[in-house]
Amino acid sequence: MDALIGDFADFHKECSARTALHLVNGKFGKVSVWKHGPTQKSFFYKRIEHKHFNAIEPFVHHLMKFNKYFLRLFYSLHSLREHLLVMDYIPDGDLFDLMQTEPRLREPEISLIAYQLIDALQALHKHNVVHNDVKLENVLYRRFEQIYVCDYGLCKIAGSPSTFEGTVDYFSPEKINKHAAAVHFDWWAVGVLLYEISTGKHPFKLDQDESLDVETLHKRQIQLDVTFPADFDNPFLEEFICFLLGYCYDYRAHSYEVIQKNTYWKSIVHWKQR
């Protein structure tokens, strides 16, 4: 441990804060960007108070360290006040940032994001881990190249007790009903995210600026059909999103095995393999 601390101290001395970059801090952590002088490489520094720190976060970093869709972790250290994670920096921001400038994406970009995000989550699910907070802000994106799933502090081992943690907008019916954590929590959230990037709206909000509570969201999940703008011209994508967001679990795309059978997914795989 002393050697690790010494190594980090030497590393940090060679870094300078990139103060011109304004990042939005998460609910449980403060994020800054530092540049390492000798290599000119930038890193995320994430500082988390001990009361908010979840050991599963560095665990998932370690678990997925060979997967290109997850952030590499270089240091994980703690002091009396906080825990520090030093990770790869992705310069282009997240999907939420992108949607502020381009409120509606088009093909083939949507297919690229869908393919990589589903591939990333399936790799995580193979380890029996649920991300549990899939949303626009937690998908970093090098435009037209690659996504990176980030923020693993709310990850759950499948089968563990579930609570109302995460972002309400992406809660599945089962999460609202406090079922045990399961991979289908993530697949529902993928459906919401794909709807957002392809329409610029939320599937269950009457107004994009509306703040949903759990009760209102659940009522609309039951009562409302997912509808699309009149000019939406991709029937296969529309059907796929509706398949992910069907209220009835038995008729929904609740697993990777079911997703693989969908026409839109098959077309993406074929496109990627050309």
Swiss-Prot record:
Keywords: ATP-binding, Kinase, Nucleotide-binding, Serine/threonine-protein kinase, Transferase. Transmembrane segments: none annotated. ATP binds at L23, V24, N25, G26, K27, F28, G29, K30, V31, K46. Pfam families: Pkinase. It is an enzyme of class 2 (transferase). InterPro entries: Kinase-like_dom_sf (IPR011009), Prot_kinase_dom (IPR000719), Ser/Thr_kinase_AS (IPR008271), Ser_Thr_kinase_AGC (IPR050236). Its EC number is 2.7.11.1. It catalyses: L-seryl-[protein] + ATP = O-phospho-L-seryl-[protein] + ADP + H(+); L-threonyl-[protein] + ATP = O-phospho-L-threonyl-[protein] + ADP + H(+). The keyword tRNA processing does not apply. In vitro, can phosphorylate histone H1. Belongs to the protein kinase superfamily. Ser/Thr protein kinase family. This is Serine/threonine-protein kinase 1. It comes from Lymantria dispar multicapsid nuclear polyhedrosis virus. The lineage of its organism: Viruses, Viruses incertae sedis, Naldaviricetes, Lefavirales, Baculoviridae.
